[in-house]
């Protein structure tokens, strides 16, 4: 099974568990770091994700994973909040953070810059518009490697 199919299958099975514990399933990733594999589950809610909430989700998801055993190789399960400087993966995430400052990392430079920072004004399936100082800058989505919320306290 491809990594993409694995993640999609896990989302379908994990999301009801996370929602049953009053959290939103923000993102799932399965990554190799050094010699170790990690299944990372990011959860969120209106009030954020507490340590106790992460522990509850971890226990519930761990039970499911033990039952369905979807990953043949050994791995560590990590459940956490996406953090203040979270990556914005979906249109739902972008919609939630309109009006906030974001950072766009690009695959290749536009006007000699590979990184743009500004207020998220709007987006569609093809581009993201941000306000940089007093100018609106439009960046094609296929040029964007990563979109991150600029963590501000």
Curated annotation (Swiss-Prot):
Pfam families associated with the record: DUF150_C (PF17384), RimP_N (PF02576)
Entry similarity comment: Belongs to the RimP family.
Function: Required for maturation of 30S ribosomal subunits.
Superkingdom of this protein's organism: Bacteria
Protein's organism: Clostridium botulinum (strain Loch Maree / Type A3)
Gene Ontology biological process terms from the UniProt entry: ribosomal small subunit assembly; translation
Chief location: cytoplasm
Keyword terms: Cytoplasm, Ribosome biogenesis
Protein name in the entry: Ribosome maturation factor RimP
GO CC annotation: cytosol
Keyword Cytoplasm in annotation: yes
Matching HAMAP family: RimP
Subcellular location as annotated: Cytoplasm
Upper lineage: Bacteria, Bacillati, Bacillota, Clostridia, Eubacteriales
